[in-house]
Amino acid sequence: MTKANSYTKEELIACGHGELLGKNSPRLPVDNMLMIDRVVTINDNGGTFGKGEIVAELDIDPDLWFFGCHFVEDPVMPGCLGLDAMWQLVGFFLAWEGAQGKGRALGVGEVKFTGQVLPGAKKVTYKLNIKRTIHRKLVMGIADATLEVDGREIYSATDLKVGVFTDTSTF
């Protein structure tokens, strides 16, 4: 496997099926729960902390599944889906680094919402700054992230934590 510095939607879906970064690597969700259309850039030496960064995007279409049910006559993207996308990207970073096992969100320090994603928006941009990765018996990534809608920052999250486990039966 050769690590690329950007990924298409098709490649992200392949990751969800264990076909991109290895069968035993952490996987992204697929179908409606994949909240990312492309990874614009990924590296292990950039970002605020010099330990890696990811910039990814989601194209907004008024026909996206959540606008029809959240809420009736008041459609808005659920904030938890943007937060989940951030966790998805931390897990993807660990897979990209070569982690083996199943990724699980472990927590977040602080989350702030200062805006909303509405059906008329065009694009969501996720920006993650990797703070730390641990590759011992425990594999874990910690990152700070923001979500922008059409260039305006509306979510921020600190200390997003994702672990990678070889056995999740007791988790």
Swiss-Prot record:
Q: Which GO terms describe its molecular function?
A: (3R)-hydroxyacyl-[acyl-carrier-protein] dehydratase activity; trans-2-decenoyl-acyl-carrier-protein isomerase activity
Report one GO cellular component.
Answer: cytoplasm
Q: What is its EC number?
A: 4.2.1.59, 5.3.3.14
- Please name the GO terms of the biological process aspect recorded for this protein, alphabetically: unsaturated fatty acid biosynthetic process
Please tell me whether the keyword Lipid metabolism is annotated for this protein: yes
The catalytic activity, as recorded, is:
a (3R)-hydroxyacyl-[ACP] = a (2E)-enoyl-[ACP] + H2O; (3R)-hydroxydecanoyl-[ACP] = (2E)-decenoyl-[ACP] + H2O; (2E)-decenoyl-[ACP] = (3Z)-decenoyl-[ACP]
User: What are the UniProt keywords, alphabetically?
Assistant: Cytoplasm, Fatty acid biosynthesis, Fatty acid metabolism, Isomerase, Lipid biosynthesis, Lipid metabolism, Lyase
- List where in the cell it is found: Cytoplasm
Q: What is its biological role?
A: Necessary for the introduction of cis unsaturation into fatty acids. Catalyzes the dehydration of (3R)-3-hydroxydecanoyl-ACP to E-(2)-decenoyl-ACP and then its isomerization to Z-(3)-decenoyl-ACP. Can catalyze the dehydratase reaction for beta-hydroxyacyl-ACPs with saturated chain lengths up to 16:0, being most active on intermediate chain length.
The record, for PANTHER family, names: 3-HYDROXYACYL-[ACYL-CARRIER-PROTEIN] DEHYDRATASE, 3-HYDROXYDECANOYL-[ACYL-CARRIER-PROTEIN] DEHYDRATASE
What's the protein called, per UniProt? Answer: 3-hydroxydecanoyl-[acyl-carrier-protein] dehydratase
Q: Which organism is it from?
A: Shewanella amazonensis (strain ATCC BAA-1098 / SB2B)
Starting at the broadest rank, the lineage of the source organism is: Bacteria, Pseudomonadati, Pseudomonadota, Gammaproteobacteria, Alteromonadales
- Give the gene name: fabA
